[in-house]
């Protein structure tokens, strides 16, 4: 295979959606910082929802974006929690994978802290090819990536099975 067609991990995004600002949000940020070692950023509400008492641009969650070695290390920890099994429906048609972890205490070495409580999280794995993806991100001369270069679902499944020993449950 051409080395520019090789699939690599672009980023791993870890998200905790709290749904409200305040004390629970700071606790969720503390959990993410303990797990990843990076300072999380707040996610804001896109629109107001009266039933949930959420206003537009109100912080309602925290997330951390991990790249390169940090992404691979955290992904190994997260897949260990899931017993290296991901369901087939977790992959989208562009080769990205998403799964949830119900409790942060499932991670190796993490103990329950009654001051923090229980927080689950969503993990998103974004894959890309080594070459060719810059044309979609650059400022001048942007173009869409041809479908022949885009990562297919089957290629993403094969990448995770080969590199992380993940079994995809169908």
UniProtKB/Swiss-Prot annotation:
Listed HAMAP family: Ribosomal_uL5_A
Pfam family, one: Ribosomal_L5
Family membership: Belongs to the universal ribosomal protein uL5 family.
Entry keyword rRNA-binding: yes
Chain's gene name: rpl5
Gene3D superfamilies tied to this protein: 3.30.1440.10
UniProt keyword list: Ribonucleoprotein, Ribosomal protein, RNA-binding, rRNA-binding, tRNA-binding
Subunit structure: Part of the 50S ribosomal subunit; contacts the 5S rRNA and probably tRNA. Forms a bridge to the 30S subunit in the 70S ribosome.
InterPro entries the UniProt entry points to: Ribosomal_uL5 (IPR002132), Ribosomal_uL5_arc (IPR022804), Ribosomal_uL5_C (IPR031309), Ribosomal_uL5_dom_sf (IPR022803), Ribosomal_uL5_N (IPR031310)
Organism phylogeny: Archaea, Methanobacteriati, Thermoplasmatota, Thermoplasmata, Thermoplasmatales
Naturally occurring in which organism (per UniProt): Thermoplasma volcanium (strain ATCC 51530 / DSM 4299 / JCM 9571 / NBRC 15438 / GSS1)
Any one of the GO BP annotations: translation
A cellular-component GO term for this protein: ribosome
NCBIfam families attached to this UniProt entry: PRK04219.1
Functional summary from the UniProt entry: This is one of the proteins that bind and probably mediate the attachment of the 5S RNA into the large ribosomal subunit, where it forms part of the central protuberance. In the 70S ribosome it contacts protein S13 of the 30S subunit (bridge B1b), connecting the 2 subunits; this bridge is implicated in subunit movement. May contact the P site tRNA; the 5S rRNA and some of its associated proteins might help stabilize positioning of ribosome-bound tRNAs.
GO MF: rRNA binding; structural constituent of ribosome; tRNA binding
Protein name: Large ribosomal subunit protein uL5
């Amino acid at each position: 295979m051409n080395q520019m067609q090789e699939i690599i991990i672009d980023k791993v995004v870890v998200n905790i959606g709290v749904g409200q600002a305040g004390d629970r949000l700071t606790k969720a940020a503390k959990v993410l910082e303990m797990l990843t070692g990076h300072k999380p950023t707040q996610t804001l509400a896109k629109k107001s929802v009266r039933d949930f008492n959420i206003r537009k641009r109100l912080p309602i969650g925290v997330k951390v974006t991990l790249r390169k070695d940090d992404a691979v290390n955290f992904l190994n920890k997260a897949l260990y929690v899931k017993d290296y099994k991901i369901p087939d429906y977790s992959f989208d048609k562009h080769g990205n994978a998403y799964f949830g972890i119900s409790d942060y205490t499932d991670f190796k070495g993490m103990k329950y802290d009654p001051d923090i409580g229980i927080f689950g999280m969503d993990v998103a794995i974004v894959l890309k090819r080594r070459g060719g993806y810059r044309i979609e991100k650059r400022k001048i001369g942007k173009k869409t990536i041809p479908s022949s270069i885009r990562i297919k679902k089957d290629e993403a499944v094969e990448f995770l099975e080969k590199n992380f020993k993940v079994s995809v449950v169908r």
